[in-house]
Amino acid sequence: MTENKNPFLKPYNTPHDTAPFHLIKIEHYEPALLKGMKEQNEEIDAIVNNPEAPTFQNTIVALENSGALLDRVTTVFGNLMSAETSDEMQELAEKMMPLLSEHSNNISLNEKLFARIKAVYEQKDQLQLKGEDAQLLQKTYDGFVRSGANLTGEAKEKFRQLNTELSILTLRFSQNLLKETNNYELALTKKQLEGLPESSLESYAQTAKDKGKEGSIITLDAPSFVPFMKYCDDRSLRREVYMAYNTQCTHNNEYNNVDIIKQLVNIRMELAHLLGFSTFAEYKLKKRMAETSDAVYKLLNQLLDAYTPAALKEVAEVEALAREMEGNDFQLMPWDWAYYSEKLKNKKFNLNEEELRPYFELSQVEKGVFGLATRLYGITFKENKEIPVYHPDVKAYEVFDKDGSFLAVLYTDFHPRAGKRSGAWMTSYKEQWIENGVNSRPHVSVTMNFTKPSAGKPALLTFSEVNTFLHEFGHALHGMFANTTYSTMSGTSVYWDFVELPSQIMENFATEKEFLNTFARHYQTGEPIPAELIQKIVDASNFNVAYACLRQISFGLLDMAWYTRQETFDGDVRAYEKEAWKKAQILPGVEDTCMSVQFSHIMAGGYSAGYYSYKWAEVLDADAFSLFKEKGIFNQEVAASFRENILSKGGTEHPMALYKRFRGQEPSIHALLKRNGIIN
C-alpha cells in the first residue's frame, strides 16, 4: 500500500487533528504500526548514539517525545478493539500484539539507552530539576528499572520472554470471555418472561429481531442479564441464567480460562521475583497511593469489620421477605438475591427502578450532566458533525473553557452492539501536553452500554445507568482538564488507586435533589421528577449498601490472594477462590461457578493487585465530597480547587500531596461510613 493512501501516515486535516475514522480501513493498521515501530527505533538510536553527554533534554525529554506515530496508531487500534472490533481486527491483534510487546520490551531493555538514563538520574542532585521535570526523570528511571533494565544475561532474557507470554495470554483471556458471552443466547416464551418490565421485554424482542429470529432472546450482556436476574419470576430460569453467567470460561471447550489464569498469576509472580520483589502485589503497590499490601489489607479489614454486621442484617431481611412469599423452608441463593432485594426495595421504599426510567431520557440526562460541568467549572459543549466518528451511534463534541478557549474533544458512544465489549469506560484518543509553549488539547471518549431506544420509545436509563454516566464523565473531566507539560503524566495517568476519585466523586450528585431538578423530566409529559420520588431515591441509595460493600471487599480479597503469592500456583482454582474471599461471603457458595476465570479487571485489565482501589477511591470521594456538601454542592470555589489541585495535575505529584492540598487533611473512612448510614 502506498503511504499517501494511508491516513495514519499523513496529516489528518480534520477539526482539532482528530482521528480520521471515516478514512481508516483494516488494511491501514499493519503498515502504520510497522512504520511507527521503525520510526521509534530510529529515534531511540539517535538518542543512544548521540555523541554528546546524556542530559535531561537530549535523553529523558527526547525519549518522552519519541514514538508519536506509533502512539497515534496504537491508540486508535487499541480503543477500537474494545468499541468497534471485528474478527479481522482480532486476528490482526493476535498477529501484532507480540510484535508490539517485543518492540516496547526492546526499548525498556535497551542497555545503552538505560545507561544514558541512569547517567542523568545519577546527576539528579546536581541537576536540581523542579516539579514535572523531576517527576519525569524519576518516572522514566523507575519505569526502566521496573521493566527489567537493571537485569543482565539470562534474567533479562527470561523477563523479556515472560512479558511476551503475558501479552498473548491476556489477549486470549479477554477474547475467550468475549466469545463465550457472545455465544450464549436463550430464547424465551411469554410465560417465562413474567415479572419483567416493558423496557426489558422490548429489548429482548429487539435482540431476537437483530439476530433474525422470532420471539424474545436474552444474552449475558449486562443490559440483558441484570434486569432478568432482578425481575424474572421463574426461579429455575433465574438459576439457569445465573449459572450460565457465572460458569463462563469454565466449560470443556476452547474458551476455558482455568489454565490461562494459572499461567497469568504465575508469570506475574515470576516477573516480580526477577525484579527483587517478594510478590507481584509488592511490585505493583510500590507505585500506588496505598504503597504496601499491609495498607490494602488494613483498609479491606477495616471496611469488613464496619460493614459485616449491617450486611448480615440486610441478608436476613431479604431472606425473611422471601420466606414470607415462598414458605419458611426457603433458602436464599445467589440467583435469588437481586430478585427478592428488588421486591424488598419496592416494599420499603415503594421505589421501582422502572418508574424512574421515564424521567431519565438519555438526551435529558446528557444535558443534565453537561449542565453540571457548566455550573461547576463554566465549561460548555457543542456538537460538531465535522469531526469524524467510528460508528453512526457516536457523537463528537467540542468542549470550551469558561473563557471561551478550546478545551477538548469529547466523543460519546452510548449503546451496545456486536463488536463492542460490555461495561462502561473512558478512554483517550489523544493525550494533552505542552510543547514550545503550545498547549495541545486532549481527545477523550466515554463509552457505555445503555439500553437502546426501541419501538416508539427513546432510550430511558435506569438510575444506576445515570450513576454510570456520571462516573465515566468524571474520568472524562480528568482527561479534559489535563494541564501538564508531558503527555505520559497528563489526565488519568495517575496512580491506579487515585484514578477513581474524579469519577466516583461525580456519582455523589446523582442523589442530590438540586442536581436532579435540573434535568429529570418525564419524557412524555415534561413533568419534573416529583420531590417524593427524589426522596425515595435518596432513602433507597443506601439500600443493601453493606452487602454491596462486602461484595467489593470479596473481589479485593480475591485479587490480593492471587497476587500476594510467593510460590507457583497449580491447585484447584475454585477451591482457592472460595478460601480467599470466604470471610466476605454471606450467601451460600454455588458449585461449578468461578469468578476468577472471567475477572477481566485483575487478569487482563489494569487492576491486578489493584481491585481494592475502588473502595480506596470511595473513601477518598466520600471524604472529598463532604467538602462540597459543607460549602454547597455547586460551589464554584470548591470546584475550582478540585480542578486545580486534582483534575489538572494528572500524575505530576504524589496523589496524597495533591489530595491534602485540596482537602486540607488526609482522608478517613468516617465520611463513607456516614454517607452509607453505617454511623450517624
Task: List each model region and its residues.
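Intrinsically disordered or highly flexible coil/loop and linker segments, enriched in small
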Residues: 38, 42, 46-53, 69-86, ...
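Short, hydrophobic/aliphatic alpha-helical segments
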Residues: 257-269, 443-446, 484, 649-651
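Active-site-proximal, well-structured secondary-structure segments within enzyme catalytic domains
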Residues: 132, 136-137, 165-168, 175, ...
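Short pre-active-site segment immediately N-terminal to the catalytic Zn-binding motif
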Residues: 451-469
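C-terminal, non-catalytic "cap/extension" segments appended to globular domains
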Residues: 2-28, 35, 195, 215-217, ...
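Short, hydrophobic/amphipathic alpha-helical patches that form generic packing surfaces
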Residues: 68-79, 138, 142, 243, ...
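Short His/Asp/Glu-rich catalytic/ion-coordination signatures at enzyme active sites or charged loops
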Residues: 13-28, 77-96, 119-161, 219-259, ...
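N-terminal helix-rich structural modules
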Residues: 2-197, 628
